[in-house]
UniProtKB/Swiss-Prot annotation:
It comes from the Eukaryota. The chain crosses the membrane at residues 913-933. Residues 164-179, 236-247 have a biased composition (Gly residues). Pfam families: SOGA. Residues 340-724, 809-833 form a coiled coil. The lineage of its organism: Eukaryota, Metazoa, Chordata, Craniata, Vertebrata. Keywords: Coiled coil, Membrane, Phosphoprotein, Signal, Transmembrane, Transmembrane helix. The keyword Protein biosynthesis does not apply. This is Microtubule cross-linking factor 3.
């Protein structure tokens, strides 16, 4: 009957391993263990089904007697299965009986669990609700089952302990009997708080938690038999207490640590209570009958089952005591009623604490859920904002890259231009052309706007004058109307008096009232008219003040130019009467007339020279080429320099003449302005100077005549230029027609198309200022046009005879000459455009100086622009001269018959320019007879010489 020492070692080892496993499970709950990662991440939505099942599991706390019929049926089935398993089990040694429950444990449904609820996994700790439910069930069921156990005790002596009562069925597999069953009777001290038995881990691995939790009433029957099974008689409740340890919520390390802290406190309190119970009941423990031992076994089992911590603490202790007792079972004395009430009170306190802990756990869970949702929201918002900022930064980076590429391209372009200018020293032609075009457009726009402003100002002044006249007429009409009304009233009164009507009272009163009312109305109207007249007079005074200010400004300008009228004259001119001033003005006028005559003579000479050059050109065209092409090119290169020099001199002279004409026009305008100022100033001087008005008027008329003469001369210059261009184009066209003969060359169509293009270009140009004279024979009569049509050109030549032998050379020369003529046309067009721009600019500058509308900066910029235009025009003219010399050298030779036929035409050709000049002078008869005679004499002298 005695148990060998090795028999108690195995249960002790198993109990120690089970305790270590339970402690390890507490220290590392699910989600924080070293072997298994957490099933839920903070970002995942948690499954609330576990909480619902946990709440459903907690709901029947302490209500064991109120279980429904379904649960009772499940418990009965579990008991029947336990009885079957105990009947099948074989008897063996104490170590075999101790470990049998751990080896052959069948998992069963907990007592308080719903059939559809989630069950804890094998090796996990049971929920406190299930533990408390099992405790309450045992408390209510023990008094009823005690007699049954007593009766069935003798029949079961010597049987091995059943599955439900084996210590290996719960966590405390090696738990011994009650606290009073030791041999010496002295109570063992409770184990330290950090002590962990080995049986805990062994039982935890055995996956028999459900069997230790579910109580079976027949387990107490095994306590009657002495031997190895008697040691484990009380292990049913102890195992249930240890197997029903505090379940850890699968939520996180923080919750598990909090629960461990509270469970340690409860375990310490339960250990203290158990120690007190041992001290009270330890002395009365002795061997007794099985009947007396039954309540002793059942009563101590209630205390550790009330708290899972106490059960876990007492499990290893009881297993150690059971192993050390040598298999002797000692019956404990029946406890008194006072410790029983204390145990009940402590159990209720523990239940309240458990409820509080659950509530705290729920609040902590809710707070953790809220924190997790907030963390998820913050993370999502942070990610969204970060993504938006990243996208914006990318867009900004793309825009910056585009701008950098554009700026780099512009920088490289500017550097290339700068390097090219530094290497070659040439100005960009495109930029120059664009600037010229912009300048031309700006000038045209400014001129047009100036004209429009002048027109609008004139219209405004005319409308104001008309309004004033209409107001005066309206006032006069109103006054006349009022006078007529007064006369009509008087006539009515006279007619009434003559009739001598008798019903006077009312009519006389009305008649007496109406004259006073009419007088008041007349006075009001007159007052209104007087006010309007006063307003008109104010406007007139304001206008007069403005004119006065303007004249004073002009007078100040004149004084700054010529000095004050009353100031002493310089040393060369003795201060005297105004007659000296008049003499000076007359002298200036004579000088201007002489310069105008000289310019006219030079113009005539240049025109005659132009005609002579044209005649020489025609003569050169009629000559035959003697020799091969190489001597021809040598002659061209030799005479080219001479012709260039000659034409350059002619162009320079014409340019100087144009400048002199412009300067004279400006001087003439200044003189007229000076005379106007003198005229205005002379009105405020003494009466002794009134006799000079006639002289100043005569001088003014002479100046006007000189100005008209200069304008006519400038118009004639422009007319001659235009006629020269027209004649050149006609001559070239006729030359082409005469050279090609019957065969139609495409050059004719090109020339015609060029002429058409010129006309279209002239039409497409913006409108310029009004020209001061007719251009190009626009006002010529039919006779003059007929005479012009008779000018000697190559069209009067007879058709050429048979072609010479060198036909290919002649054709090649013709093609080269036609291309050169086309280029000459374009150059002539450019020269004409630049000359018109220059003349318009001169006129505009002269007008600006006259009216005082120009500033110093504008004057300097315009002078620079004029110089640039002069240079461009001179270069183009030089190129045109060179091209003309080249064309002259490329003339196709003619036969001797053609030269003989051409000689009589050249004789008449010498007198035609004189006839044309005389006709032009007759048409423009504004010149004096002396100038006309001088011009005719010069023409005849030139041709005779």
């Amino acid at each position: 009957m005695s148990q060998p020492p090795s028999g108690g070692a195995a249960p002790a080892a198993t109990s120690a391993s089970a305790a270590a496993a339970a402690t390890e499970a507490r220290m590392h709950p699910e989600g924080c263990s070293r072997k298994q990662q957490r099933a839920q991440s903070p970002a995942r939505p948690r499954d609330n089904s576990l909480r619902q099942t946990a709440g459903a599991t907690r709901s029947p706390l302490g209500v064991g007697p109120k279980l429904n019929s379904v649960r009772q049926q499940q418990l009965q089935q579990q008991q029947q299965q336990g009885n079957k398993i105990t009947g099948r089990s074989t008897s063996g040694t104490g170590s075999r009986g101790l470990g049998g429950g751990a080896e052959k444990a069948v998992p069963s449904i907990p007592k308080g669990a719903v059939p559809g609820a989630v069950q804890p996994a094998p090796g996990a700790e049971g929920s406190p609700a299930a533990i408390l439910a099992s405790v309450s069930f045992r408390r209510s069921g023990q008094p009823e089952e005690a007699p049954r156990e007593i009766e069935s005790g003798p029949s079961k002596v010597g049987e091995p302990p059943p599955l439900g009562g084996v210590g290996g069925g719960g966590e405390g597999g090696g738990a011994g009997g009650g606290p009073g069953d030791r041999e010496g009777g002295a109570p063992q001290p409770p184990p330290p708080r950090g002590w962990r038995g080995k049986g805990v881990r062994a039982t935890q691995r055995g996956s028999s938690v459900a069997e230790g939790v579910s109580p079976s009433p027949p387990t107490a029957a095994t306590s009657k038999t002495p031997g190895p099974g008697s040691r484990n008689s009380g292990s049913g409740s102890t195992g249930s207490g240890s197997g029903g340890g505090g379940s850890y919520w699968k939520e996180g390390c923080l919750q598990s640590e909090l629960i461990q802290f509270h469970l340690k406190k409860e375990r310490a309190a339960a250990a203290a209570a158990a120690a007190q119970m041992h001290t009270k009941n330890g002395g009365g423990g002795s061997r007794s009958s099985p009947v007396a031992g039954a309540p002793a076994i059942c009563e101590p089992l209630v205390v550790p089952s009330s708290s899972p911590m106490a059960a876990a603490a007492e499990g290893p202790q009881q297993s150690a005591e059971g192993n050390g007792s040598g298999g002797a079972m000692q019956a404990a004395a029946p406890p008194s009623s006072q410790p029983h009430s204390q145990q009940l009170q402590e159990q209720e306190d523990m239940q309240e604490e458990m409820e509080k802990l659950r509530e705290e756990n729920e609040t902590l869970k809710n707070e953790i859920d809220e924190l997790r949702t907030e963390m998820d929201e913050m993370r999502d918002t942070f990610f969204e904002e970060d993504a938006c900022q990243l996208q914006e930064m990318r867009h900004e980076l793309e825009r910056a890259n585009k701008n950098c590429r554009i700026l780099q391209y512009r920088l490289r372009k500017a550097e290339r231009k700068r390097l090219r200018y530094a290497q070659t020293g040439e100005i960009d032609g495109e930029l120059l052309r664009s600037l010229e075009q912009d300048l031309k457009v700006a000038k045209d726009v400014s001129v047009r706007l100036h004209h429009e402003l002048e027109n609008v100002e004139e219209k405004r002044t005319t409308t104001e004058d008309e309004n004033e006249k209409l107001r005066q007429q309206l006032i006069e009409v109103e006054i006349a109307k009022q006078a007529l009304q007064n006369e009509l009233e008087k006539m009515k009164e006279l007619s009434l008096k003559r009739r001598g009507s008798k019903d006077l009272p009312k009519s006389e009163k009305k008649a007496q009232q109406t004259p006073t009312e009419d007088d008041n109305e007349d006075l009001k109207c007159q007052l209104q008219f007087v006010k309007e007249e006063a307003a008109l007079m104010r406007k007139k005074m304001a206008k007069i003040d403005k004119e006065k200010d303007r004249f004073e400004h002009e007078l100040q300008k004149y004084r700054s130019f010529y000095g004050d009228l009353d100031s002493p004259l310089p040393k060369g001119e003795a201060g005297g009467p105004p007659s000296t001033r008049e003499a000076e003005l007359k002298l200036r006028l004579r000088l201007v007339e002489e310069e105008a005559n000289i310019l006219g003579r030079k113009i005539v000479e240049l025109e005659v020279e132009n005609r002579g050059l044209k005649a020489e050109l025609d003569d050169l065209r009629g000559e035959d080429f003697n020799g091969s092409s190489n001597p021809l090119m040598r002659e061209q290169s030799e005479s080219l320099s001479e012709l260039r020099q000659h034409l350059q001199l002619v162009e320079d002279e014409t340019e100087l003449l144009r400048r002199n004409v412009a300067d004279l026009e400006e001087q003439n305008k200044r003189i007229t302005a000076e005379l106007n100022k003198y005229k205005y100033k002379s009105s405020g001087h003494d009466s002794s100077r009134h006799h000079d008005n006639a002289k100043t008027e005569a001088l003014q008329e002479e100046l006007k005549a000189a100005r008209l003469q200069i304008n006519e001369l400038s118009g004639k210059v422009m007319q001659l230029q235009y006629e020269n261009r027209v004649l050149m184009s006609n001559m070239q066209r006729y030359d082409l027609a005469s050279h090609l003969g019957i065969r139609g060359s495409p050059r004719d169509s090109d020339a015609e198309s060029d002429a058409g293009k010129k006309e279209s270009d002239d039409d497409s140009r913006p409108p310029h200022r009004k020209r001061e004279g007719p251009i190009g024979g626009e006002s010529d009569s039919e006779e003059v046009r007929n005479i012009r049509s008779l000018t000697p050109t190559r069209s009067f030549y007879p058709t050429p005879g048979p072609w010479p032998k060198s036909f290919s050379d002649r054709q090649q020369m013709k093609d080269i000459r036609s291309e050169a003529e086309r280029l000459g046309k374009t150059i002539d067009r450019l020269i004409a455009d630049t000359s018109t721009i220059i003349t318009e600019a001169r006129i505009y500058v002269a007008n600006g100086d006259l009216f005082g509308l120009m500033d110093e900066e504008d004057d300097g910029s315009r002078i620079r622009e004029h110089e640039l235009l002069y240079r461009i025009n001179a270069q183009m003219k030089a190129f045109r001269k060179e091209l003309q010399t080249f064309i002259d050298r490329l003339e196709v030779p003619k036969s001797a018959d053609d030269r003989g036929a051409e000689e009589p035409i050249s004789v008449s050709q010498m007198f035609q320019p004189i006839i044309l000049l005389i006709l032009i002078l007759v048409l423009f008869s504004s010149l004096s007879y002396t100038t006309i005679f001088k011009l005719v004499f010069l023409f005849t002298l030139f041709f005779v010489l």
